[in-house]
Amino acid sequence: MKRIYVFLPAAALLLAAACSPSQPAAESDFTRFVDPKIGTGGHGHVFVGANVPFGMVQVGPTSIPQEWDWVSGYHRSDSTVIGFSHTHLSGTGIGDLFDVTVMPVVGEVTYARGTEDDPSSGLWSYADRTREIVRPGYYSVPLTRYGVTAEMTATSRVGLHRYTFPASDAAAVVFDLENGGCWDKATDTGFRFSDDSTRISGWRYSTGWARDQRVYFAAEFSKPFAKFETVGDKYARASFSTTDGEQLLVKVALSPVSVEGAETNLAAELPEWDFEATAAAADKAWNDELSKVKIATEDETAKRIFYTALYHTMVAPSVFCDVNGDYRGSDYEIHRAPGFTNYTTFSLWDTYRAAMPLMTILHP
């Protein structure tokens, strides 16, 4: 693994040199310096949630969209949550994605985005931001409307949710395929469900920044649902009875190619139900990448700023192919190239000056 040692404040110049003659004090835990909430105010537009470096899945909260500054789905001034979407942009100047939104609920709900001036108008809940936890590869927040604590972590192609429910005969997980990021609009959606009451799958086609975007998903629950119902072709509800403090896990895998591709990705990347091990693996993936650059300073604030910025450079571009290499090309045909990984969300007009040159050093 390439190691780069950087002396502040001339970090940018010394990154280009790719090394220094002096060795800083040994450091092994770099994720502890990352504060994913840096950049969530003003015009920062950064993603908050769980992912791994360059992962296809960025699973995290999506608020009721308001203005341009909500294009990542999260703004520190807003505590609404309409669900946890599996794709997000970060740091961009335009909105899109928010594909396959999932929301744990209790009781009857209105199947819509809703408005903040009417709490019963949609699926949304306020989040208790005072108890919100976010670190590389892990996100957690209590939803005050439903009394549910939502946690999530991820592999490259799979989001893993853990919901802690109150005692209820009306607990449920709602899949929302209508929700999209700002200018994104669903054009074709649908669901399938299995006979064993533990799996559902489907697709979401949309238009927006990407004129014809196609995402397929496969989801699996840690226990059978008591009832499954669809509301049109854009919403589905899997219902459960829960005891107080019961934890329900949900895996959601994505594919740019097909439902079968999503099922293959799920089986390959997350066959087990070990939430803690998955979160630890995500943390390790981030630590491995962050440790490629070491800075010679004892200033904790400088480390927090530096490693958070480095973390943000690896939210995108994101993998956009299946584990077997299948991907959908710009010609909308399915391709497979051995040894090739397809990526998307480059947003080159934002990144070509600094982030892309950095990629040539850290990820040649």
Predicted features by range, described:
Residues 1-8:
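Bacterial N-terminal signal peptides that target proteins for export
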Residues 11-12:
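Repetitive helical segments and hydrophobic/amphipathic motifs
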Residues 23-364:
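Accessory carbohydrate-recognition regions in carbohydrate-active enzymes
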